Amino acid sequence: MPDLPSAFLPLLLLSKFVTPVTFRHHRYDDLVRTLYKVHNQCPDITRLYNIGRSVKGRYLYVLEFSDYPGTHEPLEPEVKYVGNMHGNEVLGRELLLQLSEFLCEEFRNRNQRILRLIQDTRIHILPSMNPDGYEVAAAQGPNTSGYLVGRNNANGVDLNRNFPDLNTYFYYNSKYGGPNHHLPLPDNWKSQVEPETRAVIQWIRSLNFVLSANMHGGAVVANYPYDKSLEHRFRSPHRTSNSPTPDDELFQTLAKVYSYAHGWMHQGWNCGDYFPDGITNGASWYSLSKGMQDFNYLHTNCFEITLELSCNKFPRQEELQREWLGNREALIQFLEQVHQGIKGMVLDENYNNLTGAVISVTGINHDVTSGEHGDYFRLLLPGTYSVTAKASGYEPKTVTVTVGPAGPTLVDFQLKRSTTQVHPVQKAPGRGQGSRAKQPRTSRKKDQAAKRHRGPA
């Protein structure tokens, strides 16, 4: 076993009963068999579903982990991992298969940390967003020649340059006024993107994701938004300008969580390049347009970072175990970050759930909205904040909230109908695309957690 920092020892000790896994590259059929194997081993906490097909008809499979798979539980956050967006960048794909087996085995072994994670979180794992590109790259195998072979999808399109460009609209709105969140898509967006991109967009619109990471290769660094430079400068021998989001401090913290839990990312010097703390603003490294992490932030409630995980885009099979051991703790710690900040229900005077209510934090020019079940999640660093909830036809309500370092603060909002507006209220429907609705659990565990972290109503 490679030498690893002492911080890895607790998780390694908890993992002594894990069934040995094979560290090898998985072609498409093998990937599907592996996902089904994990699902069959842990049917009570997993669901295997697909979000669409690739250009060549391969399914984009997602493995979900939850104590109620297929169900959104109000106040339980949704988090996702996406791998293999570029077909020739394969480490993320293999890490996510390893992570899936690890979560299943550790749950069966009653690892308390993993039990708590799966009981309190709905986790979605998409190992390969670009299975067609992967098959092209895998036919070549680990080889430094043909560096970009298989990067694009079967239509020759780079999927990380294929999302609707919402940055331009946001930069304009920031200067002249306009929405700072959930920017609308053009009417013809479906005809402008590839099948894989369309599938992912429909997926992230159907579930209220809170946190995400997108895995790449060719460097070792945690990259956070924005990817597109305000100055519209693109990759050159010199770094472009930093383009921070309104949540820049939070994004830097999320990136550092992964970097410092990783075996060597935090050291900075990797792959012949240097990134302080092992993190970088995307545009500060090089500017790209129509990327996925910026799209998540500007169109949904989801905060996504991009993880560059290996110097070699297609590492040799013999390197996979070392890479897994170097990333395992970071993968778990990043998932746990979804449980910070504030969350709660937005209700009307009759205790009906309100969907689409806007949650604003004074001093941070980026809002989130309540989901279809009336619950909202707002990632925040520890501190004291002024938070406002507002919905059409209702009087806004503002409270002062203190966020601590251990777990989210629960803050519910009950809004009174406005006496000056007569707009109809939009109530949360009972069911949403891709999942069943479930009433909030009243278990002692969640009641006690709510009491510990409840903020002002």
UniProtKB/Swiss-Prot annotation:
Cofactors named for this entry: Zn(2+)
Compartments in which it is found: Secreted, Extracellular space
Similarity-based family: Belongs to the peptidase M14 family.
Cofactor details (free text): Binds 1 zinc ion per subunit.
Residues binding Zn(2+): 86, 89, 216
UniProt lineage: Eukaryota, Metazoa, Chordata, Craniata, Vertebrata
Function: Protects the body from potent vasoactive and inflammatory peptides containing C-terminal Arg or Lys (such as kinins or anaphylatoxins) which are released into the circulation.
Keywords noted in UniProt: Carboxypeptidase, Disulfide bond, Glycoprotein, Hydrolase, Metal-binding, Metalloprotease, Protease, Secreted, Signal, Zinc
Listed InterPro entries: CarboxyPept-like_regulatory, Peptidase_M14, Peptidase_M14_domain
Gene: Cpn1
Annotated disulfide bonds: 42-104, 271-311
Residue positions with a glycan: 400, 402, 409
Record's subunit section: Tetramer of two catalytic chains and two glycosylated inactive chains.
Protein name (record): Carboxypeptidase N catalytic chain
Signal sequence annotation: 1-23
Peptidase M14 domain location: 24-338
Catalytic activity line of the entry: Release of a C-terminal basic amino acid, preferentially lysine
